[in-house]
Amino acid sequence: MSIGILGKKLGMSQLFDDDGNAVPVTLIEAGPCRVTQLKTQSLDGYTAIQIGYGVSKDKHLSKPEKGHLLKSGKELLKHLKEFKVEENSSYEIGKEITVTNFEVGQKVDISGKSMGRGFSGYQKRHGFSRGPMSHGSKNHRAPGSTGAGTTPGRIYPGKRMAGRYGGKKITTKGLLVVKIDDQKNLLVVKGSVPGKPGSIVNIRPNNTVGNKGGTKS
């Protein structure tokens, strides 16, 4: 069973297929990550592999965190992530997880934090139509009606209104791996990935029935 990997979104570009069609792709610096802990059913109640990514400064970590990370290597890591597995006997603490864990043609799920846009209005946040801009209209970007009158006498929870837009965890599923460069730790996937360039993303094999998920160990 294949586990996932942490990486950094570099940005978008395009490749050309055999027919000359432009394919939009996202470039991700995937790993290398280090196995920092192996969790077992007997000790932790479940079986999982914890990996770390990105170098952290000493001053940003507490003593318990530094003690935990130094058990797996000399470098202090900034981001940790767990992946539940059926068994982890093929892994050991300190083992390096690289982009070679994936293969071209495989489908992956990628999670990241969407770009925060702050407090946004109805049109930007939900795509509502605006009102007339001329002929005396005073309703340009106003919300319009938000509900009925005396009954129910309130606005129902979940009503789409202005508010904070973005800055949430988003997962895009079924992205196709089109290229791998293990020399540069580069993973190239077809389509867009949540987050802005430089943000941390979590890449794991797609396990949707009928898709070519991860089978490498």
UniProtKB/Swiss-Prot annotation:
One of its GO terms (cellular component) is cytosolic large ribosomal subunit. Residues 129-161 are annotated as: Disordered. Transmembrane segments: none annotated. GO terms for molecular function: rRNA binding; structural constituent of ribosome. Residues 142-153 have a biased composition (Low complexity). Coiled coil: none annotated. Gene3D superfamilies: 3.30.160.810, Translation factors. Disulfide bonds: none annotated. It comes from the Bacteria. GO terms for biological process: translation. Keywords: Ribonucleoprotein, Ribosomal protein, RNA-binding, rRNA-binding. PROSITE patterns: RIBOSOMAL_L3. Belongs to the universal ribosomal protein uL3 family. Part of the 50S ribosomal subunit. Forms a cluster with proteins L14 and L19. One of the primary rRNA binding proteins, it binds directly near the 3'-end of the 23S rRNA, where it nucleates assembly of the 50S subunit. NCBIfam families: L3_bact. This is Large ribosomal subunit protein uL3. It comes from Prochlorococcus marinus (strain MIT 9515). The lineage of its organism: Bacteria, Bacillati, Cyanobacteriota, Cyanophyceae, Synechococcales.
